[in-house]
Each structure stands twice: as structure tokens, then as C-alpha cells.
Amino acid sequence: LTKQDNRSVYKTGRSPCFEIPTVNRPPRYASPVVELRQYTLKPGQRETLIALFDREFVETQEATGMTVIGQFRDLDRPNMFVWLRGFESMETRKDALSAFYGGPVWAAHRDAANATMIDSDDVLLLKPAWQGAGFDLSGSKRPTTAEAQSMSDRSRLPGFVEISIHHLRPGAEAGFAERFQAEAVPQLAANGARLLGAFISEHCENTFPRLPVRAGENVFIAVAGFDDGDSHAGFQTALAASPAWRAVRETHWAGSTKPAETLRLTPTARSLLR
């Protein structure tokens, strides 16, 4: 680790990864580095992991310098737990993960957490797709553990989130993001979606190799929010009937290397993002 122009730079096998200058670093909630984590769980274990996670792994992770952005049930995959966490920089990520996974809380609960899982290595490392595209959680308030426990009827939990993952050719992320911002974002808003964030692959070397990430991926990810599942269904119907949206898809999705993935997610009681 060296210093150049008041910035930290990692010497990696690919290209140096410059950190955001401290004086211009965005607020902590904006998370310039984001992990999208998808866990495959043993059948019937999702509620067990969610209860453990929301009780033991939220404040304790944030105490090390990361932000627990959102935790979700995947409506189409009952054995999947999806969550997002963010960091101020790749250096902060290394320090925070080292502190948490080397600390007493993970040591106390890792066996119980790991007992619910088949695979936890499906992880995409991301950065905001354009200035201002990161998550703004400044107005969000996380329920306490006690408040969350009183929300026994999950169907009444507010919020619905859609994550779309677009797989692109190497080097195509920036151009795709520019076109998406200019042409797709207005269409999403016009049809009832709230764009919560947009991200592209972060190609810096994994600074915490103990936890693998999907290296070599070239993705663009859009995260949209809705009031509830009915609002999302109405949005999908409106998009399907929109000639303008079809034109956007035909023009800009053509460069994808495979069909986009769509995750339909409901937030857990303690998710900030919803």
C-alpha cells in the first residue's frame, strides 16, 4: 500500500485501484463499494438464518465500519437469502471484514449460520454506475430487534425490491450505464419504479480473499423499489405494454452476453433498503 496524490492505491495483478480522496468521499450511507451476496440455503432454513442474521449480524457488522444495506427473501427461490452490504473503500472493506470475521461475534455464531447454508460464494463486487447512483439510505430507519420480532406477519412488511442483473461484454459496462441512465431510467420512473441504485462491476482485486467473489464478471445492476408486490406487478404489466420500453430493450439489451436475471425480493423486518 502506497500513497499517491493523497489517495490509497492497491498494487494488483490487474490495474491499480485508487480509493476516493478523503476530502471528496461521499457520505458513509452511499457505500462506494457494494457486495451483492446470494446464499443458497438448505431446504427450510431461510427463516432460521434470517432470524439469526437480523438479531446478531447487523449492528455487529456495522460496528466494524461497513453498512448492512438490505436483507431479502427471494420470492422465486425459497432456499435463497439475498443481501447487500457496503463499504467506504476497498481498504475499509479489508479492515472491516478482517475485524468482523476475526472477532467474537462471528466466532460465537458462525457454526449456526453455516449450518443453514449450502453455498455462500455467489458474490458480486460492485461500484456505483454513475455519480449519485449509489444507495441513499440517509432517511431510512432500521427497526430494532424487538420491533422486528413483533412483525410476525411477513406479508405486511412494507416494500418490494427488484434487482436486475445484466451480463455484458468486457469493457461494456460504462457505455451500457450511460445509455441506461439516459433512456431506461425515465421509463422506469414513468411506469412506477423508484430507482434505488445502479451499479457496475468493481474490478479491483478482492482485498479479503478469505471470502471469494465472482472474478471476471462484467455486469450492470439496477435496483428498483416499490410499495408492495401489487405495485411491482402493475409496473411489469405497464412495461410490457410500453412501446418506448420495448425500444429501449431491443436497442440496449442486444449487447448482453446472456439474458438478464431478475430477482424479486421482499425485505426482512430489519432491512434498510425496501
Identify the residue ranges that each predicted region occupies.
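An amphipathic, aromatic/His-enriched active-site/gating alpha helix that lines ligand/cofactor pockets
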Residues: R25-Y29, T48-G70, D76-R77, G86-A129, ...
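Compositionally biased, intrinsically disordered low-complexity segments enriched in Pro/Arg/Gln/His
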Residues: Q4-R7
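Surface-exposed interaction/gating patches
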Residues: L36-P43, T48, W130-A133, G139-T207, ...
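Short hydrophobic transmembrane-like helices used for membrane targeting/insertion
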Residues: V9, I20-V23
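Short acidic/glycine-enriched loop/turn segments that link adjacent beta-strands
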Residues: D76-N79, C204-E205
